[in-house]
Structures are given as structure tokens and as C-alpha cells.
């Protein structure tokens, strides 16, 4: 089962993104504020996508990417300056402010 895990340090932001994804018919496995919580959710699904911000409460997005199994992809939502130098393998980026249309299209592409 492919799961989507939403991870942002601000719980309200994470919940708003989850609500947007659920309204679009996507299966959201979990919403959390730390990388450790995201890894716990990741253990419960076969593969998935982590939708996250640049800096979580307990680690940076790059640390979380290192800890996740290869069967997970990551969608980083951050300002362009945060990822100008390039992104690690398995990480896609969307710039803030984010548009719902761009988020949905990117996730649909990642799910195929």
C-alpha cells in the first residue's frame, strides 16, 4: 500500500495539507511534526511519499531522507533558496507559496 505522510513543524500547516489531499481523494497515512513520528508511520506502509518542509522539529528534511527506506520518495515544500544547490536522490521540490494545483499534479506524477 502506498501511503502519504505529511510532516511539518507547524501542526496546522500539516493538517491543512492533509485536508487538501484527502479532498482530492488521496490516502494520507499520517500527519506529524517530527521526523521520528514520520519514520514510525513509514514502518506501517510498504512504500510512500513524505510531504514535508525544510526543517522539522527534530531534524532537517535531508536527515529524514537518509533514514527512510529507498521505497519512499519525498516532496519538499520550501522556498527556492533552501534547495538551490540541488536535491538528493528521491527528493522533488515545490516552492512556497504553494498552489493546490501544483501540489496535486506533482503528487499524482509521483504516484504513477
Regions from the language model: what does each represent?
Residues 8:
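Conserved acidic carboxylate
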Residues 11-30:
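Two-component/phosphorelay signaling modules centered on CheY-like receiver
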Residues 14, 35, 48-69, 80-82:
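Conserved phosphotransfer microenvironments
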Residues 31-49:
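Acidic, metal-coordinating helix/loop segments flanking the phosphotransfer/catalytic sites
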Residues 63, 78-96, 105:
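Alpha4 helix (beta4-alpha4-beta5 surface) of REC/receiver domains from two-component response regulators
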Residues 70-75:
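A short helix->loop->beta-strand "cap" motif at the edges of active sites that frequently abuts
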Residues 98-111:
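C-terminal output helix
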